[in-house]
């Protein structure tokens, strides 16, 4: 099975943010990514979050998402889009998935492989991120028991997809508040083959006890930040 992956386009009307993010260029990069995914005959495409970014109005954010959705739809490749902190801060979860309802991720089993999608756009107190929030360093996955149950019931290999970071090698600001507990749970399961992450724009790859942690470089900061993985 071939997966096409990309992360952190931060698509918006802004030409440059934070001195290094070329937000307005990302729509063209997404188009090129899907051309590549079609050439590679990918079975599924996954965006690992921060598809968009804040604008002056919610209407403009929705317009940006509509433009991206059109590219995804025209590709005819099944696509899942995880929500990232910038997506949640720009629109909120309900609005984001209202705009991208056909691309909302769902746990999926294909050819005996289980793909699990984790949403960590929550504060440490369990409250979900809302439009207008901005503390991206306070991030928490509140469904650890659900993950534990899913891993315990899995019969084959498991692949996890999440925007924020669990990998201990990534700096602390980008890691979940409960990353250590999730890391232990993943290692103890013996089922997880890889954890795919975004959020940390530099990207990195680590491996612990046979589990690969693959953090994709940000599309908004790189001309070719889209990848194919065979699982």
Model-derived features: positions:
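Alpha/beta-hydrolase fold active-site loops
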Residues: 1, 43, 105, 112-113, ...
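N-terminal active-site segment of His-dependent metallophosphoesterases
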Residues: 1-61, 153
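Active-site neighborhood of phospho(di)ester-bond hydrolases with catalytic His/Asp-centered motifs
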Residues: 5-7, 44-50, 78-85, 159-162, ...
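Short, solvent-exposed loop/turn segments at secondary-structure junctions
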Residues: 13, 54-55, 89-90, 167-170, ...
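Active-site-proximal segments of metal-dependent phosphoesterases and phosphodiesterases across multiple
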Residues: 18, 61-62, 128-132, 152-196
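Glycine-rich phosphate-binding loop signature in dinucleotide/nucleotide-binding domains
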Residues: 37-41, 75, 150-156, 189
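Extended active-site neighborhood of metal-dependent phosphoesterases/phosphodiesterases
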Residues: 57, 62-148, 181-191, 205-231
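Short, catalytically relevant binding-site loops at active-site mouths
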Residues: 122-124, 165-168, 202-203
């Amino acid at each position: 099975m071939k997966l096409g992956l990309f992360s952190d386009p931060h698509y918006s009307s802004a030409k440059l943010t934070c001195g290094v993010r070329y937000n307005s260029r990302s729509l063209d990069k997404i188009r090129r990514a899907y051309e590549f995914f079609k050439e590679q005959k990918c079975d599924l495409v996954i965006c690992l979050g921060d598809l968009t970014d804040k604008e002056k109005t919610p209407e403009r954010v929705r317009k940006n998402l509509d433009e991206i959705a059109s590219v995804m739809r025209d590709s005819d490749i099944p696509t899942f889009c995880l929500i990232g902190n910038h997506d949640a801060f720009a629109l909120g979860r309900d609005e984001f998935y209202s705009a991208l309802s056909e691309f909302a991720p769902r746990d999926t089993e294909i050819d005996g492989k289980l793909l699990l999608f984790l949403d960590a756009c929550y504060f440490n107190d369990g409250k979900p991120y809302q439009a207008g929030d901005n503390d991206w360093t306070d991030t928490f996955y509140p469904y650890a028991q659900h993950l534990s149950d899913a891993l315990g019931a899995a019969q084959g290999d498991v692949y996890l997809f999440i925007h924020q970071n669990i990998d201990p090698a990534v700096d602390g600001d980008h890691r979940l508040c409960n990353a250590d507990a999730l890391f232990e749970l993943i290692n103890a399961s013996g089922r997880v083959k890889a954890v795919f992450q975004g959020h940390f724009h530099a990207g990195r790859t680590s491996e612990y006890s046979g589990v690969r942690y693959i953090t994709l470089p940000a599309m908004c900061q790189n001309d070719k930040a889209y990848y194919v993985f065979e699982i």
